[in-house]
Amino acid sequence: MQKATYYDNAGLFGGYSYPKSDSYTYGPTHQGFSSSSIENDYQSPICPIQTTSVRQATHKNGDINGSCMRPSASQGNSQPESISEQQQAAPLAASSPSPSTNSTQKKKSPSSNGSSTATPVISKQIFPWMKETRQNAKQKSTNCPAAGETCDDKSPPGPASKRVRTAYTSAQLVELEKEFHFNRYLCRPRRVEMANLLNLTERQIKIWFQNRRMKYKKDQKSKGIMHSPLGHSPDRSPPLSGSNHIGYSGQLPNVNSLSYDAPSPPSFAKPQQNIYGLAAYTAPLGGCIPQQKRYPGTEYDHHSMQGNGSFANANLQSSPVYVGGNFVDSMPASGPMFNLGHLPHPSSASVDYSCAAQIPGNHHHGPCDPHPTYTDLSSHHASQGRLQDAPKLTHL
């Protein structure tokens, strides 16, 4: 222990000359110094305020403390050398100004960190590997990729992590985007192939595809929010417009439409004059008077619709009428049938509707006329001859 401290202390004062051990004479009263006294002597030159008298008192205390131990002759020869040099260094430290004190402290500081017996000086030291780690952490947080490149391999913020964010090149991004265009989810064999092709790892490609899918999902969501209020949804149908759509309704949308409502047939008023196209059918019938009269819309009466869906006139005559393929003798109280009022029944005239129907009186078997007409049967009854609306044949 004392040899180790001697070698450490000898390194402190390498700039001083050491006298030989035979130049000193030792009496029986001289005692060896213990390690504690050497430590006290070693620590004393650090403080520049101490005087020589204080250091002599320290040596006396060292003599008292060292009387308990009897070291060997070799140890006794080596110890006084260090003590004498400490005594020589003490007046120099006390009398020299502050620059010399700083120089001695600078000489002692490297060896004091390495010595085991010195008092530990606790100071925060930053080693080069710590500096490099912090600089790398700053570069990770501050470095941004160039335009067209993305950093998808993100590292956690801890300083211990060594993972660096991946900056993909433009060629790699083109290949990855093309692959994403065809397949959003990449299978493992294709991932291995892409990794070998682009000189990347499977993990980097997998993370890139994950981030790209999230970006695509976000873009689709933003587009849906932007276009949904005015966009055409598939459950919406275009509104029905005007005369292009003729439905089965109680009212006629235009004059020439022929819509039919089963429960309630529409009431035909005077403006609807061309519903059945009476003015177009002007071909004469065989056996009829050649001078015919058309019935314009002004000669129609406003017929009231009865509850049973039949049209009737107030003044009904017993004239045979063809209704639904049958000849029916219209009676004055007949309700549920379509009647033709104010039509005289001369024996010499007949109306041929279907080439097979006959009216008693004059049996007329004429050829089929493709345009049957409702005509006035006698010219002298033209003033009071009125024609009601023709019935709709519901059995067809």
UniProtKB/Swiss-Prot annotation:
Main localization of the protein described in the UniProt heading: nucleus
Organism listed in the record: Danio rerio
Molecular functions per Gene Ontology: DNA-binding transcription factor activity, RNA polymerase II-specific; RNA polymerase II cis-regulatory region sequence-specific DNA binding
One of the protein's GO biological processes: regulation of transcription by RNA polymerase II
Biased composition (Polar residues): 20-56, 72-85, 375-386
Stretches that traverse the bilayer: none
Protein origin, superkingdom: Eukaryota
Family (UniProt): Belongs to the Antp homeobox family.
Region Disordered, residue ranges: 18-163, 219-246, 364-396
Gene: hoxd3a
GO cellular component labels: nucleus
The protein's name: Homeobox protein Hox-D3a
Keywords linked to the UniProt accession: Developmental protein, DNA-binding, Homeobox, Nucleus, Transcription, Transcription regulation
Positions with biased composition (Low complexity): 86-104
Short sequence motif Antp-type hexapeptide: positions: 126-131
Residues annotated to bind DNA: 161-220
Compartments (UniProt record): Nucleus
Known function: Sequence-specific transcription factor which is part of a developmental regulatory system that provides cells with specific positional identities on the anterior-posterior axis.
